[in-house]
């Protein structure tokens, strides 16, 4: 579907499904006072930290952050810009980096004198100047606690300029800032103020950044993610891009792919393309189509329901959410969760051990935060080898996937790489009352595991959730179950839980463990030394 965007005037009112007239974003944005938002993204943050700590230039050094002690399938957490310039993506798997560098060096060898390398270097400038050098790169082991410390220092720099209520920490390396009230104070343009902050971060930490400036949060994110790629960097590698609604429509209504845009994943893009919508311009034009036309907003609402409104707003470059809205937001429901991707396919019994370990930790997290839950959810993803007709290795030995009438005949889905894989198992169970009892929660989770997980399939991903969590001290009026555990037993269990937490806080998470943590395939001890699934 292709439109020529020589637009008729946007209607003042548009009819939404349900019959009511909708002034929606049109009225909202007409009444909103213009604001100035800044988005700042620290450039290849983890990799830059590792370069700075080694006394190397992050913009001129080939380095990846990855745990090489795992298999080469491990994901690289960061890749330096100089290595990305060879076409290596920022979240490649380590084996993809190895393969890409191998291809690069094959080409370089052809240009080398005598087609032989006389040495190697991870310095980008040296490699450009001397074709006889082999391209090398540094593999840095992740240090998540250190990255968090550096991120905290950089946040402290932001606080020199802005109040906490005007800063939204989006991730460890990215923030949104409402700078509207500060431009007059500092007597600087948005661009100059942004540059001043980034230069201060660079001076104190050695880390540079990319930034986007726009009148709303969505556009400043797009300016940072997309527009900044098309402008030249300064001598420090800094790119600061600006967008408004008109320039966004002019530059990005024909941009493809849709997945480049914030909040548009592969699933959403696929559903849009199935409807004949390939660009943000297509979506915007569809949203103002007349009811009798093939493309109108009903098409979007039938596909996405209420979420179509967000998609339409973003297609036009609108975003009604403000920094104040973010700070005031309180979720209507809360949950606590733990997930992990296993290093190898796990058979049923070993996968059950993993779920037991994770449930044990989930309960301790509840106790530590003073929370209780009355609903548990378990999601289990199977390994791709279950859909293969060949022997495959699982923890503890080999398993031959059966062929013929006894082979796996259940529903099949596809993974990120398009490989067939059995449909994941997913289920929930309700507890008789809100609780943080290890015994009650673990028993319920084990029963759920037995109910939903196929015993003849190997497992690769596990996700456990405590849903409907509330503060324990808010339950004074809750009716208790007549068959609940005696108060004395509950008191002893709580004392044990609190003792375990106290020991771990003082001496580390591995200071006190359970017997199951030493069984073959257990992962708790290793995970206790990680942050976010990576080495602390």
What are these regions (language model features)?
Residues 2-5, 9, 13-323, 479, ...:
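Gly/Gly-Pro- and Ser/Thr-rich, intrinsically disordered tail segments characteristic of DNA damage-repair
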Residues 39, 260, 270-458:
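DNA-contacting surface of Y-family translesion DNA polymerases
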Residues 70, 184, 218, 341, ...:
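Generic "edge-of-domain/loop-turn" microfeature
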Residues 213-219, 313-314, 372-384, 458-470, ...:
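A glycine-rich phosphate-binding loop feature that marks nucleotide/adenosyl-phosphate handling sites
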Residues 388-392, 474-478, 525:
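Short conserved micro-motifs at the rims of enzyme active sites and ligand-binding pockets
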Residues 447-502:
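C-terminal hydrophobic structural anchor segments
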């Amino acid at each position: 579907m292709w439109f020529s965007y020589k637009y008729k005037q946007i209607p003042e009112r548009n009819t939404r499904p349900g019959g009511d007239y909708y002034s929606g974003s049109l009225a909202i944005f007409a009444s909103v006072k213009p604001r100035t938002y800044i988005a700042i993204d620290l450039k290849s943050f983890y990799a830059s930290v590792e370069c700075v700590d080694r006394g190397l230039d992050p913009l001129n050094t080939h380095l990846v952050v990855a745990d090489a002690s795992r298999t080469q399938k491990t994901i690289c957490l960061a890749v330096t810009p100089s290595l990305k310039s060879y076409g290596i993506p920022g979240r490649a798997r380590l084996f993809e980096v190895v393969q890409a560098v191998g291809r690069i060096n094959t080409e370089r060898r052809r240009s080398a004198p005598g087609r032989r390398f006389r040495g190697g270097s991870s310095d980008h400038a040296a490699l450009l100047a001397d074709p006889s050098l082999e391209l090398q790169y540094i593999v840095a082991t992740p240090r998540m606690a250190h990255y968090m410390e550096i991120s905290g220092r950089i946040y402290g720099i932001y606080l020199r300029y802005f109040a906490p209520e005007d800063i939204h920490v989006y991730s460890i390396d990215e923030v949104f800032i409402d700078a509207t009230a500060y431009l007059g104070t500092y007597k600087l343009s948005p661009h100059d103020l942004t540059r001043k902050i980034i230069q201060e971060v660079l001076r104190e930490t050695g880390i540079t950044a990319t930034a986007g400036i726009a009148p709303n949060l969505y556009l400043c994110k797009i300016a940072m993610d997309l527009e900044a790629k098309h402008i030249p960097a300064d001598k420090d590698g800094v790119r600061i891009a600006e967008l408004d609604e008109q320039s966004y429509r002019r530059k990005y209504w024909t941009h493809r792919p849709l997945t480049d845009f914030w909040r548009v994943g592969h699933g959403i893009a696929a559903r849009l393309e199935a409807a004949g919508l390939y660009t943000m311009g297509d979506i915007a034009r569809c949203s103002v189509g007349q009811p009798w036309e093939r493309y109108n907003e009903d098409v979007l609402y039938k596909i996405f329901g209420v979420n179509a409104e967000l998609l339409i707003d973003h297609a036009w470059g609108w975003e009604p959410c403000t920094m104040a809205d973010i700070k005031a937001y309180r979720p209507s429901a809360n949950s606590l969760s733990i997930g992990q991707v296993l290093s190898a396919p796990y058979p049923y019994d070993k996968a059950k051990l993993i779920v037991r370990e994770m449930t044990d930790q989930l309960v301790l997290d509840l106790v530590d935060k003073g929370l209780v839950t009355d609903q548990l959810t378990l999601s289990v993803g199977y390994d791709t080898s279950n859909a293969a007709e060949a022997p495959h290795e699982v923890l503890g030995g080999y398993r031959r996937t059966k062929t013929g009438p006894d082979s796996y005949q259940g529903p099949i889905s596809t993974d990120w790489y398009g490989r067939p894989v059995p449909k994941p198992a997913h289920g929930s169970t309700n507890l008789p009352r809100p609780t943080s009892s290890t015994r009650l929660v673990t028993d319920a989770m084990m029963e759920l595991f037995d109910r939903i997980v196929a015993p003849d399939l190997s497992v690769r991903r596990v996700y456990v959730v405590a849903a409907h969590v509330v503060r324990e001290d808010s339950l004074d009026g809750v009716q208790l179950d007549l068959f609940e555990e005696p108060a004395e037993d509950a008191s002893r269990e709580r004392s044990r839980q609190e003792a375990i937490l106290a020991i771990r806080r003082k001496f580390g998470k591995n200071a006190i463990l359970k017997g199951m943590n030493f069984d073959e395939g257990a992962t708790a001890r290793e995970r206790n030394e990680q942050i976010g699934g990576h080495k602390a």
